[in-house]
Amino acid sequence: MQIVLVSGLSGSGKSIATAVLEDVGYYCVDNLPLAMLQPLVEYLKQEGYARVAIAIDARSGASFAQLPQIAENLRAQGADLRVIFLEAKTLSLVKRFSETRRRHPLSSDTVSLPEAIQLERETLADVAPLAHRIDTSDLSASALRLWIKDLVGPDRSRITLLFESFGFKHGIPLDADLVFDVRCLPNPHYVEELRPFTGRDPGVREFLEASPDAMALLADIRGFVENWLPCFIRDHRAYLTVAIGCTGGRHRSVYFAETLAAAFQAREQVLVRHRELS
């Protein structure tokens, strides 16, 4: 049985994720108390369900500390289990709740919205380390739908490598597993004729490929990922997010993400995301 657990912060896109999973053929259960997870899986397995998506949220309470053991038990019973954790920056979540005029499930007359968001982060702290984390702060609903489809669509027996470019001035992605800083390299932004372009364009690529430092750093990052990827696979990781950052997230980091993705494309399942270009 294939099982996808969807969790995360309220307002981060859990309902969108479960809707996508339902569209691609998963039987979906929403807001399930964690204590009911194993009994439900056993029942659905007996009934012949092959693909199940279950959404769990902070209203399950203190029982989240039990999730690592529950996940281990399900895998020991033969379940192909993946956990997706959706999150976003507090300012993004506050803006979304303000726009929709919905009330946060943990807020009250004595608990403000930012306090409720922080309380939810703390409540779900045991879930995030088990999961593939997706930072939806800068993702549109349509982009998140495509993202979820990509994550559940490939062959589940192989790890999926995600190479993500970003700009440090906008913050490090919350969902990054490995972070590499390429700000030490020559910056095409200061070459007037290259400034309007991105790391996908030939002129920027040629500029960086003419730099011995850029080529040496690219080789080092590729070698690091190649050397340690087997360790992540042995740890039963379904996804590995490799984030590469420069100052603005448009030139150097984009080139590195594109080039690394191309290098691994033939051997692994690869996705590319350019946060500041989306």
From Swiss-Prot:
GO MF term set: ATP binding; GTP binding
Highest rank taxon of the organism: Bacteria
This protein's record includes keyword Glycosyltransferase: no
Residues engaged in binding ATP: G8, L9, S10, G11, S12, G13, K14, S15
Positions of GTP binding: D57, A58, R59, S60
Keyword entries, A-Z: ATP-binding, GTP-binding, Nucleotide-binding
Family: Belongs to the RapZ-like family.
Job description of the protein: Displays ATPase and GTPase activities.
Designated name of the protein: Nucleotide-binding protein Tbd_0529
Provenance organism: Thiobacillus denitrificans (strain ATCC 25259 / T1)
